């Protein structure tokens, strides 16, 4: 399986109309590890309406603008019915910004249907965060091509905290970073705080959520990176390093106090 860069174009809570209140991107590695970041557009949500949704001068967005962040693994199976063949995807949440216990959440599954314009229609059922009620939904996704011009096509790093000598959690943080082509997304969370980031090479054209609102481009000039989204302690995430060189599986990378481990490299 190849890695995928998926951009959501719309979501529809049945029977309502389709809309897209977020800038949603999912980076999925060839082995199915993913980081899914959904940021409310400026003007969406209570925080943005009352002014709390604007970024500060450093380019950081407030967590009022975070709709959802997820990291985990995905698998797909083929389901055949008398009428059609369906690709059913299952998403295992290892990290989830909406809950401290993602393992206890109901299965996250969606059925995928190809559309004539090359996009994908996903159908499923999940809790509508606006109502708190399980609701049928439809999402439309567009996949971008994965550029091959970067140092390494895909690298995935994971941080899983550590325990003391008698098995007590000393650091409860968990994190995942996926770099795919010229894009990268990272998500790290503990019980008390979290950080979410999205980066891309400077010659890509997508607008920066932070740069457009803060009056600066929020660029990391040294690495020619553009930070599209930054929330919380993004210095915990290996954003510059994943673009700087090639990595091997099992390699360890120190980022501040955190020792990340490479779990996938292509």
Predicted regions and their residues:
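Lipid interaction determinants
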Residues: 1-69, 79-266
